[in-house]
Amino acid sequence: MEPKRRGDRFGRRGMLLGVLSATVLFLRVGNVNADISLPPVTVGVGVQTSAFSCSTSCIYSDGTVKQGDSNVQGFELDSIRLYINGSVTDNIKVTFNTEYNGSTDAVGVLDAIGRFEFSDKFNIWAGRFLPPSDRANLYGPYYANDWTPFADGVADFYPDIENGRDNGVAYWGQFGILKVQAGVFDGESLNSAVADKSRLLTAGRLTLDFWDPEPGYYFNGTYYGDKDLLALGLAGQNQNSKTAWNLDALMEKKLPNLGAVTVEAEYQKDNGLTSPAPNHGWYGLASYLFPQLVGIGKIQVLGKYSQKTVDAAALEDTATLELLATPEDKIKTTEINVNYIIKAFNARVGFYYLGQKDDIADTSKKEYGLKLQLQL
């Protein structure tokens, strides 16, 4: 029996030593971990959802068709986004944004950006992001003043691979009232229909902010009275001898009664960069934010009118290789909003009406509904 008791004693002693050793090791590792500081990371979420009714071919806020049938009513999760931003150092940062898109019922990578930001005048971005383009493309559906900014086909007409984004590298900097943005991107080189894929797309934008500045790479469609803004922008892109350019303007002024009036306009011209047939178009938008607080928010009214003209052209039939004459076509779009602004773009809800008429197709679309946007 004695050998067994001795073995038990040694076993208990060995077990005790093992526990003590593990405890000491844990404490040491814990002390090491306590000294490690992870890079700062922020996580955010954005949601857009709607209840709608349309006569035919309901349209998403990104301009794609929602439903092809007539007299459609329903609810839609238009979009949900996940935002992740982190800093490697004070000057090297990373952005990663994803989106579930209700128009495709799929999740895609919106932005994947390595951001090298050294000063107001010198910054380099590389990866997937919005190239220098029109103001509307650079604010997108979550920071637009209206609910369906791309339904007219005028705004955001530049080539892209994911909601206006493209893969490439860009420089941007601020010089007083002038912001300069320029870059090189894949563009149409991702499109198998383009014969010459050896040339990349070049893009550039100049923005003049005569009143308050707009810091950073991106823009807003409105600042809900937080800024007095008078901005003028010129953007252009070129690839394979095809060009597209636009001129845009935004004016926002807080009035003596603390209400805010906003006026936005854009003219665009596409010489075959994104469409076989050259086209041009324009839109004008005006909104007024009432100063009175109604409950937890303020009332805003908005109206927008746009017209896009697809030029007459001789296009090649891909099957027969014959040239087919296409007549000029005009597409006219009207949008009306009555919005309830709770916390700028982080919490807003609104009624919208969208009407669109196509002269050549001799069709008209009418859509109205309620939209909700939340961000954190």
Feature names for model-found ranges:
Residues 35-61, 69-190, 196-214, 220-224, ...:
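Outer membrane beta-barrel
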Residues 1-12:
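N-terminal secretory signal peptides that target proteins for export/translocation
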Residues 28-34:
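Sec/Tat signal peptide C-region and signal peptidase I cleavage site
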